[in-house]
């Protein structure tokens, strides 16, 4: 049932045949990518690495894309302009919290590569399934 719900949402919200997916290789991005795949969409999956160093996310994203035959696009995020990038996020994009700046920073470099009209992202399962820092602290002794 949940599969059908997610597939229907992807079908309604991303009607084009070719879509971009922000791919981490984790449960969220794989779920939304699988839904698009079932709809026979062409997937262009974008992930990033920082300063030429692969992360677990970029490694798992590449493996998933190879396995399913999705297009894989690895974007290298430089760190040589990080101070200006952070000020851009704060001033231009009005990021207020440290986590907003940290999580948004790579997308200054990823988004210019995306040409598709529709971009699929994960569903924030961390918040729903209790794997956030707050949930881990709260349920530490249960």
Residue ranges and their predicted role:
Residues 1-142:
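ATP-dependent adenylate-handling active sites, centered on carboxylate activation for C-N bond formation
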């Amino acid at each position: 049932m949940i599969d059908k719900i997610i597939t229907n949402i992807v079908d309604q919200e991303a009607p084009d045949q070719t879509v971009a997916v922000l791919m981490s290789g984790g449960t969220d991005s794989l779920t939304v990518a699988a839904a698009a795949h079932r709809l026979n969409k062409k997937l262009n999956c974008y992930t990033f690495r920082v300063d030429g160093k692969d992360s677990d996310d970029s490694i798992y994203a590449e493996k998933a894309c190879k396995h399913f035959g999705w297009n894989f696009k690895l974007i290298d995020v430089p760190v040589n302009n990080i101070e200006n990038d952070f000020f851009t996020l704060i001033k231009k994009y009005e990021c207020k919290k440290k986590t907003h700046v940290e999580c948004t920073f790579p997308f200054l470099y990823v988004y210019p590569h995306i040409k598709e009209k529709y971009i699929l992202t994960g569903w924030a399962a961390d918040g729903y399934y209790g794997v956030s820092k707050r949930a881990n602290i709260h349920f530490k002794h249960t």
